[in-house]
């Protein structure tokens, strides 16, 4: 199996495992997060020592920041959960990051809508 393909499979499996681990946490501070957090993607380093976990959170910027901080606080739990379920020499160190891809796509769509509406206004004037 080619290493790139194996890494993609590992990334997908880690993404799934972290989502499962979040649902299993019984801490009160996680209760509100469970419905508003999405693990959008995982990128593992070539040597498989690090995994960047990109998180999308529905809410304002303060809630997103708090969610990433909370996930960072519990990253030892998540790493242990991954280690028990993935057959690797060592479990990768997890680094949680806010995924701004969804936010950026919404911003770009708004800009495109503005451009289209301006073009419609200019076209109807002539």
From Swiss-Prot:
One of its GO terms (molecular function) is ribosomal small subunit binding. Keywords: Cytoplasm, Ribosome biogenesis. It comes from the Bacteria. It is found in: Cytoplasm. Gene3D superfamilies: 3.30.300.20. SUPFAM superfamilies: Ribosome-binding factor A, RbfA. GO terms for biological process: maturation of SSU-rRNA. InterPro entries: KH_dom-like_a/b, RbfA, RbfA_dom_sf, Ribosome-bd_factorA_CS. Pfam families: RBFA. GO terms for cellular component: cytosol. Monomer. Binds 30S ribosomal subunits, but not 50S ribosomal subunits or 70S ribosomes. Belongs to the RbfA family. One of several proteins that assist in the late maturation steps of the functional core of the 30S ribosomal subunit. Associates with free 30S ribosomal subunits (but not with 30S subunits that are part of 70S ribosomes or polysomes). Required for efficient processing of 16S rRNA. May interact with the 5'-terminal helix region of 16S rRNA. This is Ribosome-binding factor A. It comes from Thermosipho africanus (strain TCF52B). The lineage of its organism: Bacteria, Thermotogati, Thermotogota, Thermotogae, Thermotogales.
